Design a protein with these regions (language model features):
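Acidic (Asp/Glu-rich) sequence patches and key acidic residues
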Residues: 1-104
Length: 104
């Protein structure tokens, strides 16, 4: 699924590929992200998961979405939700427009 993600002055079209593990963890199913706008999708992701980012020994950025919860549209704020997508983007900061990002 793809969204346009804006970070600072850059705006990129990014495709997010959600792993089977993520798909099974997301309460309510991954289908609720289909057709959602970037802010809706971000809000859904944010409501159910909290992101933990880190850098490994080789300097690679990693992001892990932890937790579970009822993923319901309209919960929390759009700003918080967009921050979740922004963190996903920042974990793959070297990605270019049209690249695909795998989310575990």
């Amino acid at each position: 699924m793809g969204w346009t993600v804006q970070v600072g002055e850059w705006e990129r079209d990014i495709t997010f590929n959600f792993s089977p593990l993520f798909r099974t963890m997301i309460a309510g199913g991954i289908r609720q992200l289909a057709g959602a706008t970037a802010d809706e999708a971000a809000t859904i992701i944010w409501h159910g998961f909290r992101s933990v980012s880190s850098t490994d020994e080789e300097g690679n950025h990693e992001i892990i979405l932890t937790g579970s919860g009822p993923l319901v549209r309209g919960q929390n704020t759009v700003e918080e939700g967009l921050n979740a997508l922004t963190e996903l983007w920042q974990a793959c900061i070297e990605a270019r427009a049209g690249d695909e990002v795998m989310v575990f």
